[in-house]
A protein has these predicted regions:
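General secondary-structure edge motif
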Residues: 6, 40, 63-64, 85
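Hydrophobic alpha-helical membrane-insertion segments
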Residues: 24, 71-73, 96
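A generic structural signal for short coil/turn motifs at secondary-structure boundaries
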Residues: 16-17, 69-71, 125-127
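Di-metal (Zn2+ and/or Mg2+/Mn2+) metal-binding site signature of metallo-dependent hydrolases
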Residues: 54-76
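Generic detector of well-ordered alpha-helical packing
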Residues: 16, 51, 63-65, 94, ...
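Divalent-metal coordination cores built from histidine and acidic residues
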Residues: 55-56, 75-154
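Histidine-rich, glycine-flanked metal-binding segment
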Residues: 1-57
């Protein structure tokens, strides 16, 4: 049995958290990086991905994306693909409803660590003029029940 499921071979590894920038191989097993070193034994991998001339780095985090969209014609799966292709592995959506976000995940598969915030926008998601505290509590409770991770006040 191969030690690594995948080796990403010969790329320029950029890892600021560990002060690393070097040409190296990245050994992955069980979905986790288990070793980073020059010249890992490629015969000990189920798959080898040639990354020569490419950067290899931890996934990016985008804390304000609009993958769920607000228009009925917007397909959240397209936003998911765009994020993954750009190297993003974790994203907080701030562009649509929890249902839209979940619908995109169901069609595309997650592929990302993704969560959504509910925006409290006067004249859009909350009344324009000074809503009573009980109304705001109800709106927040509803958003959290529908799957929002948090609330952003605008």
């Amino acid at each position: 049995m191969a030690r690594y499921d995948v080796i990403i071979a010969g790329g320029e590894v950029l890892d600021p958290a560990n002060n690393r920038q070097e040409i190296a191989d990245v050994g992955i097993s069980g979905g986790k990086v288990i070793e980073v070193a020059p010249d890992l034994d490629r015969s000990d991998a189920g798959e080898v991905i040639d990354a020569e001339g490419q950067w290899v780095m931890p996934g990016l985090i985008d804390t304000h994306v609009h993958v769920a969209g607000t228009r009925s014609t917007w397909d959240p799966a397209m936003g998911h693909r765009m994020l993954v292709e750009a190297g993003t592995t974790t994203a907080l959506d701030f562009g649509g409803t929890p249902e839209g976000l979940i619908g995109g995940i169901q069609r595309m598969g997650a592929g990302l660590n993704i969560g959504g915030l509910f925006g409290m926008v006067p004249e859009s998601t909350i009344p324009k003029d000074d809503p009573p505290p009980a109304a705001v509590r109800d709106i927040v409770d509803d958003a959290l029940t529908r799957g929002a991770m948090g609330i952003k006040m605008l």
